[in-house]
Amino acid sequence: MTVHMKKPLAVVAHDASAAAHPGSARSTTNAATAPTTTPRNPSAVAGNRNRTGIPAHAGANRGNGADGHGAIASTATVANKTGKTMMTVSQLAMLTVVAVASLRSLPAMADYGLASILLYLIPAVVFLVPTALVAAELATGWKGGVYVWVREAFGNRIGFLAIWLQWIQNVVWYPIQIAFIAVSLSYVFGMGGLGNNGVYVAAVIIVLYWASTMVALRGGNLFAKVGSISGLIGTLFPALLLIVFGIIWLAIGKPVQTSLHASALLPPWTGIASIVLIVSNVLAYAGMEVNAVHANDLEHPGRQFPRAIALATALILLVLVLPTLAIAFAVPHRELGLIDGINLAFREFFDHFGMGWGTPVISLLIALGAFASVVAWIAGPSRGLLAAARTGLMPPALQKRNAHDVQEGILIPQGIIVTVLALLFVLIPNGNTAFATLVDMATALYLVMYMLMF
């Protein structure tokens, strides 16, 4: 792209943002094959903030909205002047919430009662908030996600390592998350034991993952709608329902299954095991950076992305802390399972209040929320991997994009890998243990990515 320095700064910055966006028509030509009639901008190769070498926030962050008054839509998808459909603050925030917050972990934390508050807040202060702030700062200055951020500091190869670590961690995580969906769906049909059937779990993983891939292949606007709507009804609504149940439980004087003394606010200290517990909760907040690749899908990234991150941070803490306490108040610790613990917790509440019909309904909503998290994670890391692939670090076949400008050259092989991993539930009797080991290994690799990011 030729840069005419006589343009107003805001126009140049806008052009830079469009050029850096993977979905932009201007980005379809690799810098290495740019037309010789147009001088190549050295910043596109040297690793400046964007292809013009001008900070992306120099003009774009100060621009007004389409109405000339800086109005920002926050509840509906909008279109910019070029007719391109844009994300909104609420959509991106919801995608981030469903990518990070998982209802599956609530029962395990409920076992610690009031101490779970501190066990959530410490990792939030030392990891979640710093990660959110770093992601907001980097995303509004350097477009492209983790790959671009690390590349700016350490070069292309280390940048590729960072995005690969993020991507491979997710490839292993997809079957685990969809297995949780399979268990929730078994409660929908009143067959909770079906979740132990390897063939059933593998079939659900394969079908739902490829369905998620088809959604992602249709383009950013569709997956944003699916992710935000499913996240609302499948993550926020069940979390709020647990909070309501917990309040009612206390208000009517039902027996509380955990200690409410002030001393219970401090988790028991058992040496190194307590440190491991806090670290594991740190990893529960991983993913705040994954949707930074969609910053360019906002009308005004410099203003809207930090707002989306701030909103997502507040919602994540809401989804995790208060529902965990509600479960701790009402559900005996011995009944808290791991994979199906959240379903058992809701069944305890519904059966107690004579609403047994609610268990399959809420299990379906939880499955939708988990499905939304899969959709949210499919698009982010693979899109960042595409940015690395286009520098020549991956074969041309993996750089292929479809008519919707989505990275099908990466998503299709990714789906094949997930399909093979899903078959392990059938082939290996202790498939859950094998997958847990793989996830632990992938998470350790993910920590290296965060070290590079910070």
Regions found by a protein language model. Give the residues of each.
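Helix-loop-helix junctions that connect adjacent transmembrane segments
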Residues: 76, 83, 114-118, 193-200, ...
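Membrane-interface "cap" regions at the ends of multi-pass membrane proteins
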Residues: 1-21, 26-33, 37-136, 140, ...
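Helix-loop-helix connectors at the membrane interface of multi-pass transporters/channels
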Residues: 8, 68-74, 78-82, 148-152, ...
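Hydrophobic alpha-helical transmembrane segments in multi-pass membrane proteins
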Residues: 95, 120, 124, 170, ...
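Structural signal for membrane-spanning alpha-helices in multi-pass inner-membrane proteins
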Residues: 132, 187, 212-216, 242-246, ...
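TM-loop-TM module centered on a large, flexible mid-protein loop between adjacent transmembrane helices
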Residues: 147-150, 155, 187-192, 308-375, ...
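Hydrophobic transmembrane alpha-helices that form the core helical bundles
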Residues: 110-111, 129-209, 213-217, 222, ...
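Hydrophobic alpha-helical transmembrane segments
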Residues: 93, 118-122, 160, 202-207, ...
